[in-house]
Amino acid sequence: MLSPKRTRFRKQHRGRMKGVSYRGNHICFGRYALQALEPAWITSRQIEAGRRAMARYARRGGKIWVRIFPDKPVTLRPAETRMGSGKGSPEYWVSVVKPDRILYEMGGVSETVARAAMELAARKMPIRTKFVIEE
């Protein structure tokens, strides 16, 4: 599971996801990519599940790049706890993804293999995505 080694602060505000992604929306490393079409928080477990599904399908061929990193802590209160007494403790990490953000890249495989592998990864994501080919 991906998570930061250390952070400046343990807890963060939730924030809001406005607009589209202006950074990380171009293919940089591979030839094929999976691009987000909706805003969402994507957990480190979901990122890892998508990566594993792609790697398992592509086997030894090709290389996979994960272009998002979960750097936002999400806090949860214990079950059946009364309100008050501060914010809950950090439970898991998420990546804030806006529309047009590249999630995964792939290279060194044919388009059919890449498309099928990305489709498997897309099924693990909580958002709609699209398959992109580098021009």
UniProtKB/Swiss-Prot annotation:
Does Glycosyltransferase count among this protein's keywords?
no
Chain coiled-coil ranges: none
Which InterPro entries does the entry link to?
Answer: Ribosomal_uL16, Ribosomal_uL16_bact-type, Ribosomal_uL16_CS, Ribosomal_uL16_dom, Ribosomal_uL16_sf
Keyword annotations for this protein, in alphabetical order, are: Chloroplast, Plastid, Ribonucleoprotein, Ribosomal protein
Q: Where in the cell is it found?
A: Plastid, Chloroplast
Report a single Gene Ontology molecular function: structural constituent of ribosome
Q: Enumerate the Gene Ontology biological process terms.
A: mitochondrial translation
* Source organism, top-level taxon: Eukaryota
Give any Gene Ontology cellular component.
mitochondrial large ribosomal subunit
What family is this protein classified in?
Belongs to the universal ribosomal protein uL16 family.
Q: Oligomeric state and partners?
A: Part of the 50S ribosomal subunit.
Q: What is this protein called?
A: Large ribosomal subunit protein uL16c
Q: What is the species listed in this Swiss-Prot or TrEMBL entry?
A: Nuphar advena
